[in-house]
Amino acid sequence: MKSPNETSFTNHTLENASTFGADLSIESNESLVSLDEYLSNTLPLHLQQLFLENLQKRQQGILESASDSIIEAVRDSSQQKFQNGLHLSLDSGVGSKGSVFSAWSFAQGLVIGQLSVIVVLIFFIKFFIFSEGPIKTEGPKGGKSGPKRDSAYVSPLLSTSTSHFLSSIIKRGESDGADSSENTDTDRKFSQINTILEKTYYNVETHSPETLDWFNVLIGQTIQQFREEALQKDNIVHSLNNFIARKSGELPQYLDTIKITELDIGEDFPILSNCRIQYSPNSNKQRLEAKIDIDLSDRLALGIETKLLVNYPKPFTAALPIQLTVSIVRFQACLTVSLTTAEEFVPTSENEASYGSENGGYFLMFSFSPEYRMEFDVKSLIGARSKLQDIPKIGSLIESQIKKWFVERCVEPRFQFIKLPSLWPRSKNTREEKTENDDISMKSTDL
């Protein structure tokens, strides 16, 4: 393959040769003498000129090809540099954005953390340090300021705003949400009972009765502790003697002073069984109650002695000694226990002031069914020399009075209310188990 420069050079040479041949033929026709001059002078000039022209054209082609290659190389290098620069700019942009984002995130976290600490400090200072304390009331002029204060003028330890704020924090479950404001009080209690039964997996209609063996053990330990304290410190005897001394002014004139001669608090324990949970009657399924069968076979005895005074025709004319011992040997009943509020019942006594002071909070309500069984053993001894022992009429009279007292207080439809203490943990109720080191330190202190 010939290059384009070589091809043009060959064509040009052929054209010159043809021209030269034509001129030679023309000149040879004109004159034969000028041929030598042409060969010696004119032909070298023509060849030199032809060589120079071909050399210039070849150099020009070489320069053009070199310039084209240089331009292409420059173009390729510029494109490559542009692409590399674009990649570098993109990488640098992404890195700068990442660094800016990380710095901004750190700044946000720092600012939010500082603000949260400031808010907590403001809350603590406002609601716990600068809250309204109890207002000290001054007594009248000239009078002594006693330790007693009128509770009506003492503000609560927490301010009203604090109490509202704390009450807004304590929330109940989802069932006590916005719908509770629309429901009535009856529907609310009914839904609460159903929620408790559902979440404790207890079906009132199908659940089988329980034996309460574990509860019998706890009750036995409690009663045993009570008996030990009574035997060691004579608490029951002192309490009864103090009660009799306070009531001595109310005794009839024909009775002398009463003295306690016997006190037996038993040695057995009650057995509770057949516990079942059911809806309270006449409550429209708004309150639950527990029915428990109780059985006690023991001897609970109280013995007293006194004198029957004969004040006619003059005071203390004669005195008839009387000794009585009343024992409960058997008690069977169905115990009803439930938790309720004081608003659901009314007091039976006329003194409603004490009831109003205790109104509020939750109460443990218990009562016994009318089909109870209470067996007594009454022993009586009347007289000094000729004594009458175990008179049936006296036994039946005492038994009827005790049952009457029991029915008026503890048998349905009457109930006994016991106010439950607050179950919230308090520091004054906190205790820990005593160790050997504590015993040694206490003994050394006593010595």
Curated annotation (Swiss-Prot):
Main location: endoplasmic reticulum
Cell location: Endoplasmic reticulum membrane
GO cellular component term, pick one: endoplasmic reticulum membrane
Cited Pfam families: MMM1
Subunit structure and binding partners: Homodimer. Component of the ER-mitochondria encounter structure (ERMES) or MDM complex, composed of MMM1, MDM10, MDM12 and MDM34. A MMM1 homodimer associates with one molecule of MDM12 on each side in a pairwise head-to-tail manner, and the SMP-LTD domains of MMM1 and MDM12 generate a continuous hydrophobic tunnel for phospholipid trafficking.
Notes concerning its domains: The SMP-LTD domain is a barrel-like domain that can bind various types of glycerophospholipids in its interior and mediate their transfer between two adjacent bilayers.
Annotated protein name in UniProt: Maintenance of mitochondrial morphology protein 1
